Design a protein with these regions (language model features):
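Structural micro-motif
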Residues: 48-58
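Alpha-helical coiled-coil heptad-repeat segments used for dimerization/assembly
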Residues: 17-20, 39, 75
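Local sequence-structure signature of Cys/Sec-based thiol-disulfide redox active-site neighborhoods
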Residues: 1-27
């Protein structure tokens, strides 16, 4: 089971980079393309003050990070226990 969902778009370079880093580390996550899932865009907007900024990660505890580094993601996952 993944501890977070990554909201992304196909053209987002930062998203591709973070996905590659997570995959190399063997970190599992769910992925949602906000251009294909309109309700997902609303989630991203709520996490980013009305902006559709990606990548936005939403964790199992309801918190979010926008364009985090791999280290920030690993730290957050560790804090979730």
């Amino acid at each position: 089971m993944s501890s977070f969902t990554m909201y992304t778009t196909p053209w987002c370079g930062y998203c591709h980079r973070l996905k590659s880093q997570l995959d190399r580390e063997g970190i599992s996550y769910d992925i949602v393309d906000i251009e294909q899932v309109p309700d997902a865009a609303l989630i991203v907007e709520q996490a980013n003050g009305g902006n559709q900024t990606v990548p936005t990660l939403v964790y199992s505890d309801g918190t979010a990070q926008t364009n985090p580094s791999l280290a920030q993601v690993k730290e957050k996952i560790a804090s979730l226990g």
